[in-house]
Regions:
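Generic beta-strand structural signal
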Residues: 47-54, 67-69, 79-85, 95, ...
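Double-stranded beta-helix
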Residues: 92-147
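Short, conserved beta-strand element in jelly-roll/cupin
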Residues: 76-92, 133-134, 141, 164-168
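Non-heme Fe(II)/2-oxoglutarate
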Residues: 5, 113-114, 139, 145-178
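Histidine-centered catalytic micro-motifs
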Residues: 68-75, 147-150
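Short edge-strand/loop segments of extracellular domains
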Residues: 61-62, 100-107, 165-170
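Active-site region of the double-stranded beta-helix
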Residues: 47, 72-76, 87-96, 102-104
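Non-heme Fe(II)-dependent double-stranded beta-helix
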Residues: 1-69
Length: 178
């Protein structure tokens, strides 16, 4: 359902921006082809890779949690990384990203489901949980097979852009060339 992101419906938790709009932006494609970024990805993958998908979404303050606001793993592909770009300032009150450091290397809690905080804290120490805050433009890379979530915004909405880079096509890959 389409709505104005400045006036979301009362029950809206998230709002996705149409990928077809994103891929037509020269700025978004230019950022994905930043040579420093590509060098980091090349070093990680040690083989050919491609930009597989790009998407962006708003997260709104809400009484209820949305699925991505619970710890989970992503299963897009066998070998992938995501590049996150905050398009709004993100502090502890408007939905910072949390990542369980080292969880991409272990198969604890590997089922395709969302996990309650208590289960995460039972299997990992609080010191393993990295909270990523930053100003608009903050960019970070994550292997999101590792347990992660975007915290629920409390005061302000959050806008994030995500690039998916993959060695093999993912379940998000376009079926036809873009």
């Amino acid at each position: 359902k389409k709505f104005n992101f400045n006036k979301p419906p009362i029950n809206a938790k998230t709002g996705y921006i149409d990928t077809n709009i994103l891929i037509k932006s020269k700025y978004i494609l230019k950022a994905a082809n930043n040579q420093n970024l590509l060098n980091i990805l090349k070093s990680y993958f040690e083989c050919s890779f491609k930009l597989d998908w790009v998407w962006a979404w708003w997260s709104f303050p809400s009484e209820e949690l949305a699925g991505p606001q619970l710890f989970h793993r992503d299963y897009e592909s066998m070998n992938f990384l995501k590049v996150f770009v905050y398009l709004s300032d993100v502090d502890e009150f408007n939905g910072p990203h949390e990542y369980v450091v080292g969880s991409h290397k272990v198969n604890k809690l590997y089922k395709r489901e969302r996990f309650a905080d208590q289960l995460i804290y039972k299997n990992f120490t609080k010191e393993n949980i990295l909270t990523i805050k930053g100003k608009k433009g903050k960019t970070f890379i994550a292997n999101t097979y590792g347990l992660h979530r975007g915290l629920q915004p409390k005061n302000e909405k959050r806008l994030v852009l995500v690039y998916l880079f993959s060695v093999i096509p993912s379940n998000r890959s376009p079926k036809l060339p873009v």
